[in-house]
Amino acid sequence: MDEERALYIVRAGEAGAIERVLRDYSDKHRATFKFESADEDKRKKLCEGIFKVLVKEVPTTCQVSCLEVLRILSRDKKILVPVTTKENMQILLRLAKLHESDDSLEKVSEFPVIVESLKCLCNIVFNSQMAQQLSLELNLAAKLCNLLRKCKDRKFINDIKCFDLRLLFVLSLLHTDIRSQLRYELQGLPLLTQILESAFSIKWTDEYESAIDHNGPPLSPQETDCAIEALKALFNVTVDSWKVHKESDSHQFRVMAAVLRHCLLIVGPTEDKTEELHSNAVNLLSNVPVSCLDVLICPLTHEETAQEAATLDELPSDKTTEKDTALKNSTMVYNGMNMEAIHVLLNFMEKRIDKGSSYREGLTPVLSLLTECSRAHRNIRKFLKDQVLPPLRDVTNRPEVGSTVRNKLVRLMTHVDLGVKQIAAEFLFVLCKERVDSLLKYTGYGNAAGLLAARGLLAGGRGDNWYSEDEDTDTEEYKNAKPKEELLKPMGLKPDGTITPLEEALSQYSVIEETSSDTD
């Protein structure tokens, strides 16, 4: 009945009446996502009628009402077939300021029309294969990039920027050709990186270092939404970059990684928005060539070095807050390097473990990222080793028992999801420099058996990658417990593949020097 009344007014009424009836329809169906099939034909005709109104000279408020209803109706895939034509798509492109390259964005009164047109295009392109084909024919991706360039550094049009980015994300998600076009022809990587710089108000202090104001205000909701959409679009553009990239691209990837480091060190308007922002940053960092991730850590500034030199003992006993701050800062510094971003990633990983669900989607990206960073960058590995696998003092409880990060990761080594189990074990193995005896020390043989069997290391040894050598750091507690622990380690294999008998292992053990190959 609503569609029939609205259709009658749209066909015969004047602009004021059309605006009123469509506003009523929009208010009533704002949260409608499932539609009655009996009224399908009426909704198709209403869409056609709305497009006929949009080509006329009607007030801006009437255009907005038309577009709001069109956005609601475009949630129904079935009605889009007859209305998704090249002519109708061009109408929406014109209203979204995507039709002519020289259109300006000076008329603030037009902004609601632009935003609603972009929202309609997002729904229509996502739900209609015909619209997707027309998007390629009309070169929609190039038009969206052009609109983004007009929006650059214009904070008062964040809504336009946000839905432009969302439409770019949808297009690049659905078409691999558009990903390639965005990456190479349209220079999407630097363009989208600049959008992030603008959203975060980044001030560069060095080529790949930005100023971080830890006491500054959080991002606004609009800036956060823009940043999230830009991160998602960048993910699609760079999805294969970790496999193939030119040396000339390294600078741009390092700039992007530096922007993502800044992203990890700021917060959104709410805790949930901050987690969503950081989650998308983690996903994008996974696409960055690992050789370019060195910018996630940076040398301490002179001010930070001076602050680091001040010990806790030098602070007055009544300065509890200052002591807490100094202690916090000291845990984020390693070998003269600022490790704040890595510390944030580690905390993010632990929060995802504590959630206890959706490990494959929520946990594996950050675990994979930390694993690759640790494998490629020594300072990152050593810092994470200190945080995750500190010197072993608790030798009475099983490795999987407890609430430390190590305990949580060891429990994941026997998770039912094969992917989760493998990446958790791989992360710990890399932190142990791929040494079997070191891994067994921290995880126990039963927990590590799956990884060792897959790598053919049940008899001991080490992985294929090379790591630096350092001094022994076994604790006295571990050294005292180690003779007992040796009896639980694998007894070795004979040439025929059978396990060495216990008696033979005991006789061999009596002449083996007590050593430890765990070094950092």
From Swiss-Prot:
It holds the Pfam family Ric8. Keywords: Chaperone, Cytoplasm, Guanine-nucleotide releasing factor, Phosphoprotein. GO terms for cellular component: cell cortex; centrosome; cytosol; plasma membrane. InterPro entries: ARM-like, ARM-type_fold, Chaperone_Ric-8_A/B, Gua_nucleotide_exch_fac_Ric8. It comes from the Eukaryota. GO terms for biological process: G protein-coupled receptor signaling pathway; sensory perception of smell. GO terms for molecular function: G-protein alpha-subunit binding; guanyl-nucleotide exchange factor activity; protein folding chaperone. Predominantly expressed in the mature olfactory sensory neurons and also in a few regions in the brain. The modification Phosphoserine is found at residue 468. Disruption phenotype: Death during early embryonic development. Conditional deletion in olfactory sensory neurons leads to death on the day after birth in the majority of the cases: surviving mice do not express GNAL (G(olf)-alpha) and are anosmic due to a strong reduction of mature olfactory sensory neurons, resulting in difficulty in suckling. Interacts with GDP-bound G(s) G-alpha proteins GNAL and GNAS. Does not interact with G-alpha proteins when they are in complex with subunits beta and gamma. This is Chaperone Ric-8B. The gene is Ric8b.
